[in-house]
Amino acid sequence: MSVVPTLVPPPQPSLAPGEALVLWALRLGAAQPANGPLIDQELSLAYGPLDGPPAAGALARLAATLERHGRRKLRLAHPAEAAPTPDERAVLLLLAASQARDWALRDALLLWLVRPAGRDAAARAALALGAALDRGGHALPLARVG
């Protein structure tokens, strides 16, 4: 059996491991949509064969909703970049608010990020991704993002 090296960069000191994983996957998917299978593989390695695919699906749905219904094109950094952009911070905070069930903050971020037609879909995807991250032991910090 051969070992498949992981391509996920190690967590940066300023980012929680879950934050680093989400940013890497969002950035890699945006940089090259053909990287979907690689992202699926990495999330399956991180969360296991049962929780990895739902996490990958929720991430793909959130990314697609943000792309299709975003108020504007999000600014994402290169996948290996350490620091999150302001838009990436907003997405991480959206996920943290969804995990914490802080509906007021989640709704405020949805108003900022997504046009009305996509808000329900973005809310469902953020909740699903937040739950998948929770099951994998990655609670995102609500007080400090990035």
Q: Model segments located where?
A:
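Polar/charged low-complexity regulatory segments
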Residues: 1-146
